């Protein structure tokens, strides 16, 4: 009787091991080659999490990925050099034959299509985190589809007003393709919401015309919330420094893009800063939060689409542009640092860097 029980036990163990071996063989046999293309530099702080989330999300969807990653480093190169780098890189991996390309953010998505490498027309491509998709360029590639992270400036403006009261919100712009679209979209959205937008308005008072009345007026809370779009060029930079200082109340920064000209604005500001995009939120740039497509949502959406394509759905069967889901997302550390009343946060808000002890206080009484 004992011998028979032992025999059954060994048979069960053997069958279990065979099942694991078979599953392992199937997974290794179905390995998919996926190229991931990022816009920014390789040491951008969020990419470590981003790349981990991509792999984990694909594996949860039954995809066993073999991943290669290319970092465009868009801040270091002008457009022609970016396109050449992209073309040469695609040449170098052509023999690897990727099954699918995942590309993130505006610069990499545009450059990938604009370089016109033959590979781009034959491999399914899924983009994510794109604020301003180039529809004319997309129309040339039926195999490209993805997710439009359309910035919602008005909701973010109203969020700042809700948390901090009537304010002047300043945004920084340059003359790039993305900057032109930011400015046009901002004006369009604010016009519909009856929010005044000023361009290049200097809000500090030069010493030669300063009077006590003018200075006192500049320190008062405004009667309504407005937006001031400030160029990051020439003499306007002194205004930016003034806005960042603690000497002028009721003026707050709203991040609309990530590039070298504006990268450290929130970090060095003496007042709370907010964001309409997910870049840098929850990391080192002292951003309180905003109404955005979170990094997690960005990865989930794009890898969902990628998995469907790899499992047999034609890439042409999806709409080329799908709007991304948005949430209120805040960095708990910055909310606490700036002493923002947590009761004012939207009830469905996502809190990054929320400590376990704060989440379950009764465990630490």
Positions of predicted regions on the chain:
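Bacterial N-terminal signal peptides
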Residues: 12-22
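Short hydrophobic alpha-helices and adjacent helix-cap/hinge residues
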Residues: 2-6, 25-365
């Amino acid at each position: 009787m004992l011998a028979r029980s032992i025999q059954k036990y060994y048979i069960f163990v053997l069958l279990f091991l065979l099942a694991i071996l078979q599953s392992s063989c199937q997974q290794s046999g179905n390995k998919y080659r996926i190229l991931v293309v990022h816009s920014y530099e390789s040491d951008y702080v969020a990419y470590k999490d981003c790349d981990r989330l991509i792999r984990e999300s694909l594996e949860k969807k039954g995809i066993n990925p073999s991943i290669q990653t290319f970092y465009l480093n868009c801040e270091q190169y002008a457009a022609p050099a970016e396109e050449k780098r992209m073309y040469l890189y695609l040449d170098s991996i052509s023999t690897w034959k990727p099954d699918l390309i995942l590309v993130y953010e505006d610069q990499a998505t545009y450059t990938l299509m604009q370089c016109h490498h033959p590979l781009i027309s034959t491999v399914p491509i899924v983009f994510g985190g794109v604020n301003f998709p180039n529809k004319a360029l997309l129309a040339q590639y039926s195999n490209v589809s993805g997710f439009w992270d359309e910035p919602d400036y008005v909701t973010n403006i109203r969020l700042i007003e809700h948390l901090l009261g009537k304010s002047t919100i300043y945004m920084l712009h340059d003359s790039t393709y993305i900057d032109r679209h930011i400015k046009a979209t901002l004006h369009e959205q604010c016009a519909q919401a009856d929010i005044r937008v000023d361009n290049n308005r200097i809000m500090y008072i030069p010493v030669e015309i300063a009077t006590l009345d003018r200075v006192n007026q500049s320190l008062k809370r405004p009667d309504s919330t407005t937006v001031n779009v400030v160029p990051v060029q020439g003499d306007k930079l002194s205004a930016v420094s003034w806005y960042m200082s603690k000497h002028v109340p009721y003026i707050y920064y709203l991040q609309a893009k990530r590039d070298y000209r504006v990268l450290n604005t929130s970090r060095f500001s003496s007042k709370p800063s907010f964001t309409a995009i997910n870049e840098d939120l929850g990391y080192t740039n002292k951003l309180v939060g905003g109404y955005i497509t979170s990094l997690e949502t960005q990865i989930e959406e794009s890898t969902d689409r990628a998995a469907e394509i790899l499992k047999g759905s034609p890439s042409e069967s999806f709409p080329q542009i799908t709007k991304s889901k948005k949430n209120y997302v805040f960095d708990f550390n910055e909310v606490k640092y700036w002493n923002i009343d947590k009761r004012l946060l939207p009830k469905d808000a996502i809190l990054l860097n929320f400590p376990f002890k704060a989440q379950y206080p009764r465990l630490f009484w």
